[in-house]
């Protein structure tokens, strides 16, 4: 999709989208789920992280496989979540794990075949632990106010800056990030590689 067509549809600029990792949530999709995934992939984001963490592994693998097919059609990297075995069966070498699962699988030496191992961190201590465990990417949050974390104050850009200064791997911001608000520019100025966006990308 060219810049002119994107502008006509009121979509964000492709330069911004190249710094966005889309986090999926089928419960928020504005249209049928795979149709929404296709729309997202047409925008060429940095990656699509198939979160859907409420699913058991068999159901997750089935759905993630459908998302993967769309991602491959548009040459958008696809990152699986929670289930490394499902990822490997699908030929995916990128996984995002909660910190507790990263520790579990790293101790079991189950992550050797992955080139990308991401995890979420919410404190400096967690970031240090994730780096010790060999994470190749950190997601730090939540940075801004978000309905996904109702009642919890955001950690803010000072926290993001601290994690970016600490880490020798890419750090992605997450939580309450909206395009067209100046937030992307703000998180990039903190040293982040980009921003993870769920709600807005599931409704775009």
For the regions a protein language model found, what residue spans apply to each?
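Hydrophobic faces of well-ordered beta-strands that scaffold small-molecule active sites
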Residues: 18-24, 48-50, 78-80, 95-97, ...
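Alpha-helix-loop-beta-strand connector modules within alpha/beta enzyme cores
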Residues: 61-80, 99-102, 107-123, 153-178
């Amino acid at each position: 999709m060219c810049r002119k067509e994107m502008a006509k549809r009121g979509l964000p600029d492709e330069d911004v989208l190249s710094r966005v990792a889309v986090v999926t949530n089928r419960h928020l999709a504005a249209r049928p789920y795979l149709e929404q995934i296709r729309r997202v992939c047409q925008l060429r984001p940095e990656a699509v992280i198939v979160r859907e963490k409420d699913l058991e592994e068999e159901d997750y693998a089935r759905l993630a496989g459908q998302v993967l097919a769309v991602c491959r059609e548009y040459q958008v990297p696809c990152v699986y979540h929670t289930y490394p075995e499902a990822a490997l069966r699908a030929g995916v070498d990128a996984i995002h794990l909660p910190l507790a699962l990263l520790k579990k699988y790293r101790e079991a030496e189950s992550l050797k075949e992955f080139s990308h191992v991401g995890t979420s961190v919410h404190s400096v201590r967690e970031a240090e632990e994730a780096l010790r465990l060999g994470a190749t990417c950190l997601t730090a949050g939540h940075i801004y106010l978000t309905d996904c974390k109702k009642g919890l104050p955001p950690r803010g850009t000072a926290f993001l800056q601290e994690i970016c200064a600490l880490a020798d791997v890419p750090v992605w911001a997450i939580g309450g990030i909206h395009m067209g608000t100046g937030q992307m520019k703000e998180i990039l100025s903190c040293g982040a590689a980009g921003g993870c966006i769920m709600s807005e990308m599931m409704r775009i």
